[in-house]
Amino acid sequence: MAQLSMSFLLALSLLAFTPFCSCGNNYQDGNLYPQFYDHSCPKAQAIVKSIVAKAVANEARMAASLLRLHFHDCFVKGCDASILLDSNGQIISEKRSNPNRNSVRGFEVVDEIKSALEKECPNTVSCADILALAARDSTVLRGGPSWVVPLGRRDSRGASLSGSNNDIPAPNNTFQTILTKFKKQGLDIVDLVALSGSHTIGNARCTSFRQRLYNQSGNGQPDFTLQQSYAAQLRSQCPRSGGDQNLFFLDFVSPTTFDNSYFKNLLASKGLLSSDEVLVTSSGVSRGLVQKYAENNELFFEQFAKSMVKMGNISPLTGSRGEIRKNCRRVNKS
């Protein structure tokens, strides 16, 4: 899961007209429920939405970055904001892991949200819930679906560098490896394909797909499942050496609009990452889902919303477990 500008007013208008999914969830699981802050911090969601809207208006790419933060958080020890912790004392930050190093971003936006919430209602709204809300609002601001976010997560007091290195799907993972990592989180193949659709916005670095252009299988040959004129275009900006940090749209057709173009690109053999292309080359079931979403944007939106709620429910800390951090970058002083 990886990352041009609209006016602030247009971004806000999308909030009013976006498709909505209540997703029919039972919110009793894990003690998460949408009204968690209705009395303790009634302005919480409005504060998050306002700051996310400002950040995305300043930089469209930030929407994908905030969405990715939530994904990378939930896949390591559950949705507990462990990804936000800086290295300190006994804690080795997940920001140092291979999937995150010099790649994940949006921490300053989270800091701004947390600061505003602490002023409004101190020691109340968790960093984990901030990530869940920011992911939803970012999707909406790019024209994607909305959904009701179950709330009440608490923040971890630790991080897992090994979990971040091992549990987050990598751009060059095989389909089976990616599916195994999803199943470990209680997610299935439908969730895998739908959530991969988040690549309809955002960017990837040259280093994430260079092997496809020059040495896919270790034999000095490119990945021939990649459409050749598209591959040639990519090679012009992603050479064999150098240009490691050059950015490329994950969806070159509509890179800042959340829609089903990503799936149409896959069917045309124009998925940027190997982990994108395997959705149509390695499994008949996943290819069938790609075809359905490519044909029906509404169906994609509906399933994406359901899968985001499902992902957001991975192993939350509730009750007396964890804490409500005052600063999302460090645990509270005991």
Locate predicted features.
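Catalytic cores of secreted/periplasmic or lumenal enzymes
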Residues: 2-334
